[in-house]
Amino acid sequence: LHQSKDPNTNKSTQEYTRELIARHVSGRLKVAPEHTSDRVLNIMRKPPFSQFGEFKKIFDRINHEEGLRQQLIPYFISSHPGCKEEDMAELAVITKRLDFHLEQVQDFTPTPMTVATEAWYTGFHPYTLEPVFSAKTQREKLAQRQFFFWYKPEERRNIINELRRIGPVSYTHLTLPT
């Protein structure tokens, strides 16, 4: 995934990744990309989502080469500081494109001594002092959380209403079930 300047390290990393996927996954590998928005991931102090995409390609390729039918199970968070409804709509589009029906999800829970909790509590990023939006009310949290479940017919009407509310942004790739 992360290419170093040392070819031996890169080779060792590839061998380790293949060994992990081919020999040490018992059907499902749970990973935590946590979000698709690079802006939100930056606040989380995590790498860009493209790195997860690269890993998924490697995972799928090794599964195909080894004749395996394993699943990659991603874990995502809604209502994280910096996350808005538009980010969650985009998350729905991306996870649909990747053919994920999300189940491993959670709303952000503030925990002591973290950058995210500081931003959530104060409304400012502690390092940059830039304002940071945080969903705090039940309505704001549900407005974000529903996008995890774009594939559920019972969520269709609420998601469409939320897309209309957030404005002119087009999410034409998010074809909801009827």
Cite the ranges covered by each PLM segment.
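Conserved SAM/AdoMet-binding glycine-rich loop
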Residues: 1-73, 77-81
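Short, solvent-exposed turn/loop segments enriched in Gly/Ser/Thr/Pro and often Arg
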Residues: 109-114
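Catalytic cores of alpha/beta
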Residues: 82-95
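Active-site-adjacent helix-turn-beta-strand microarchitecture at beta-sheet edges
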Residues: 105
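Conserved small/polar residues in nucleotide/adenosyl-binding loops
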Residues: 172-178
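Alpha/beta catalytic cores of nucleotide-metabolism and tRNA/nucleoside-modifying enzymes
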Residues: 128-170
